[in-house]
Amino acid sequence: MADAEASAELPEEARPDGGTLRVLRDMASRLRIHSIRATCSTSSGHPTSCSSSAEIMSVLFFYIMRYKQSDPENPDNDRFVLAKRLSFVDVATGWLGQGLGVACGMAYTGKYFDRASYRVFCLMSDGESSEGSVWEAMAFASYYSLDNLVAIFDVNRLGHSGALPAEHCIDIYQRRCEAFGWNTYVVDGRDVEALCQVFWQASQVKHKPTAVVAKTFKGRGTPSIEDAESWHGKPMPRERADAIIKLIESQIETSRNLDPQLPIEDSPEVNITDVRMTSPPDYRVGDKIATRKACGLALAKLGYANDRVIVLDGDTKYSTFSEIFNKEYPERFIECFMAEQNMVSVALGCASRGRTIAFASTFAAFLTRAFDQIRIGGLSESNINIIGSHCGVSVGEDGASQMALEDIAMFRTIPKCTIFYPTDAVSTEHAVSLAANAKGMCFIRTTRPETMVIYTPQERFEIGQAKVLRHCVSDKVTVIGAGITVYEALAAADELLKQDIFIRVIDLFTIKPLDVTTIISSAKATEGRIITVEDHYPQGGIGEAVCAAVSMDPDIQVHSLAVSGVPQSGKSEELLDMYGISARHIIVAVKCMLLN
């Protein structure tokens, strides 16, 4: 069918008049000028990448998208995610391959939780389609029929270092998108009329996400730079920029502006502040339950307290016990399958604009794969909560590949991230409740084996407050643990007591922030002696965190017990002893400190 015939069959709203088309072209020209000026003024940036997508941006923001300019965080606004190294408000940028996963989370929230009219648009470069996370997101969007999502591939042929593998073979991108179950349009990315039409057509599609594959040219509109290699990420020289700006200005036909369409105001009001459990923990001292199971039970309990609590999992729900939440609230459970990168990105999107309280759970060891997404979540100051189970050598028989021994170090680097490491079921339930109300990212580290409940249901917990479990005026050494190693410290204290050696035992509860006041006061009460014991590698773990906290006090000495080397498979208690973090090793370390 000829383009003219196809255009004639479209309704009037999909066929902007000649005056509107001129304004949209002029808007694209102004966007190019702004990108050139901005990058010249800072001597940094990507003006050629901006230029390739100028018409796309013009059509989206001034003809297609619905939003209130004066209220950019309005819940009814259409969402726009830009992963092309330019700024946007909802998530941090400057990365490649993550934008579509975040957009999936926004679209899923809009379709299934908010049940609202807002739509989600994600602009990507062709270069970032080399990232596997893009295709994780493509599979997710297709599986969940996210027909409120539009992904735009800006196919400008060039990457940072030169031509990309598919260059301008648009049919390759089209076939890939269609193979993933997406409704797909191919369009000339310089043709504002064609762009208006395909974006309108996308709005009519049901049960499928839409991909718009737009053929563009890097540096569009800039003589001798357009479609030229080696200009990626380079501002134009000032003299050349001035000449190019004059050329582009000479092509602008009108000073008229277009106001965006206002959004349809049908998003529900959401209140996710001060979410409280409806009852205290239902455990008795002496009960035995794994903290990973207690976490699953706590999530279900929190879900009852607030209907905006959602849980995502990466095909591990029977091991993380998120299946308990799934059974109670299947409509609020998102199965992300074995795609941890995308799971974290989707969680970021779901939590954006305060629409949900999102918890994402998997084995803590598998989260290393998603560290790039976690890092972006930190830069975005996102309020997502991540649960990592099966931490440390206490995992036991499953072996080293399943044992998270780097996760504390990883999350300690994230700005404003709170790290919970609960010891028993009671403290785990409090960790979940506190995380739901905390600002910034939270990480909850849970343990595989069953452990004994040591706290009463009435015990109160706060972020940054440790628990002193054993203390007396005769204490000689402070032993600091968290999670599984607290039990080893308590066992060591019992054995040393028989030898008239008294130690103070501290359960950190949160590793970040640390309870520095309690640590230092306990150290001073035990003649400056501290032993830390952790089911984690020494690098970046509890020992190093405590050392940093007391580093300004020369009278405090810290000895760290941590896992070293690559662990083997075995029984949990055997491995704790083999790798030097059992009660036996704590006793030896205490006696050595006293001798010195």
Swiss-Prot record:
Enumerate the Pfam families for this protein: Transket_pyr, Transketolase_C, Transketolase_N
Q: Which domain of life is it from?
A: Eukaryota
Catalytic EC class: transferase
Asked if Transferase is a keyword of the record, the answer is: yes
Q: Where in the cell is it found?
A: Cytoplasm
Q: Where is this site: Important for catalytic activity?
A: 46, 232
Q: Which Gene3D superfamilies match?
A: 3.40.50.920, 3.40.50.970
Name the UniProt record assigns to this protein? Transketolase-like protein 1
Q: Which gene encodes it?
A: TKTL1
